[in-house]
């Protein structure tokens, strides 16, 4: 179901013809003129609320690409000008061809105004080669009001990875952005000390249907991050994990006021020294089952940290409170139909021990099934096949649909998008730590 909203995107499929660049240029010219609008509440984009940079900061206006005579205009401008603010034209498209590394400290944002969002999108080269990563970072980066589409503009192939942090202690921030389409992971850290912030944004469609262990929002790859912060955002349609700690110790984790919908993996914490997980909706998150009835797996899957020179497990403080975690009946029925799948219990024994010794506060969490006004349909054919085959793998059924969009075309059109509003009469509408609504604030206005 889809409903009218203030959110609007539009993209057009482009098929690259190696021997006919005039054809490609024509269509890329058309798409460059298409309008892209934001997925965030309207006030994010209004002129009166646009932040003007302080005097003295370098501001570089970058003209859009046409995909034929101009590509990589953004990264070329950064290499030429270094640290600064880079403004992208609203409605413009900025193509990334080949390997693109940002080594400077930059803010990349939409130009002043309330028009449609600029788009950053990969474009394969004349030989059809598509880089594995959209952007790699050796400097700090902030993105404000940008639409990222991880689908190749020429072939419609979906990228493996979108964003990689290559050096230590880097900061990556998304504010008011819409990010979609990748197979393995959206954000990956290849070094320690990273700080990743997602605020007032939408992230969706991260899935490798042949191997659904992939499809992650954040993946530490075992490199200890300083901060992971996801706030006021909507995340949906992932085969993998929201956060993959992968045995790395995060100093600070903040997951507050978000709406999560259709995520295959449960929430495993291995490890976090301080974590606040509160005021969220987890709708159909963690439908990948456990398989041992004698020792059921947990949704909140905490692991005990061993003491070391760097970390003392006695210092851990985790707060999981005022969240709504539920599974729709059509998924619940699969645990009965395919009894080799065991539905997850809320907490494991490690979590219970941490409650007993005061390191974990677990309170005021509810399980209330909500009816969203315009959420995408669950990909039940894919999910049911996953239940049916147990641990045999999904490669033979990788073509079953999982990715979603509003109208069968890439992106958003007709001022419509999926929405996640729910009745104000729901318990969730007053269940937050401040007695307000749970979930992303954009759906409660």
What are the language-model segments listed below?
Residues 2-19, 26-29, 33-61:
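Bacterial Sec-dependent N-terminal signal peptides
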Residues 7, 66-68:
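Compositionally biased, intrinsically disordered low-complexity regions
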Residues 59-65, 75-96, 106-113, 438:
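Glycine-rich repeat segments that build the extracellular carbohydrate-interaction surface of secreted
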Residues 70-73:
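Well-ordered alpha-helical segments embedded in enzymatic catalytic cores
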